[in-house]
Amino acid sequence: MCVEESEGAERLDFGEPAAAAADAGKSKSKSPDELPSPRMERVCENTTAADFKQNKSGNFVPNIRSGDWSDIGGRQYMEDTHVCITDLAKNFGYQSVDNEAISFYGVFDGHGGKDAAHFVRDNLPRIIVEDADFPLELEKVVRRSFVHADNQFAKTTLSSGTTALTAMIFGRTLLIANAGDCRAVLSRCGTAIEMSVDHRPCSLSEKLRVESLGGYVDDGYLNGLLGVTRALGDWHLEGMKEAGNPGGPLSAEPELKMITLTKDDEFLIIGSDGIWDVFSNQNVVDFARRRLQEHNDVKSCCREIVEEAIKRGATDNLTAVLVSFHLEAPPQVRVSRPGRVARSISAEGLNSLRTLLRNQ
């Protein structure tokens, strides 16, 4: 496992003791002007081709390939980060269930600094694995692990926050957990399927939840301060959260979506909100399919998505992770056009048309 930055490589061992990782996260918070400005940063394992065993519930066996790319975009400093882990249990020294890997992917979009995003990236996967109910009650484990990671970050007294979106794949099961405005989109036979909901103050359901907990929305911002209604961190902001009280208007609890993958499911795209500022769900699926049909390289596809977002005027940090469920490129899809009527001409009509054309 590594952390890579284009300006000087930093390495992090995910197998290090939890205490050491916690000590490393307790450094003094820096102002945005003091933070480095790497062009690209990622935490990733080599996930070129991790094969899954035959799943007893069906014939489809996902063949997992993942790629990733990040760019600082138009910002002065980089607050996005992400993680890709082929085998979550093995990565932390645990035995996989039935020797079947659980792969883990996460995108974390920090605000007010990068400390919260890096803390959650480094600690959330470990917290999930160390839960007593992992992996048998995965939904329950993931939900409370988000909250636990949030509470652990509060102890660092660092002043920043982060949105978080994770994807876990176990056999044919895909579990998405989201707190914030990163987004996951699935391509199913070329059709974009939204796998997460953006948690923003403009969302009616989120606005009602916030108001029921004593918060308010002012000019599109939570309590006039934040552009998201769910995030980890931000403990320094008054009126958002309170230690020991899970009922604040800013929630770290994720919304979950779980599905069973089929052969029609081609790939999953996870992106920070900078991607979705300039791409619609269907647009990014169409773009990715065309690129994969050209070269079938998942990492190059992520780079091209990020570069295209910059060309379209994206100004935020940009992160894209693509997880393909097949070794082959997506097939061409024939688009049906409703309302088109097939028409033919008789032999007599064809002769009349020829005569008419000759006489002109």
From Swiss-Prot:
Binds 2 magnesium or manganese ions per subunit. It is an enzyme of class 3 (hydrolase). InterPro entries: PP2C, PP2C_BS, PPM-type-like_dom_sf, PPM-type_phosphatase-like_dom. It catalyses: O-phospho-L-seryl-[protein] + H2O = L-seryl-[protein] + phosphate; O-phospho-L-threonyl-[protein] + H2O = L-threonyl-[protein] + phosphate. One of its GO terms (biological process) is signal transduction. It comes from the Eukaryota. Mn(2+) 1 binds at D109, G110. The keyword Lipid metabolism does not apply. Residues 1-39 are annotated as: Disordered. Belongs to the PP2C family. PANTHER family: PROTEIN PHOSPHATASE 2C (PTHR13832), PROTEIN PHOSPHATASE 2C 54-RELATED (PTHR13832:SF531). This is Probable protein phosphatase 2C 54.
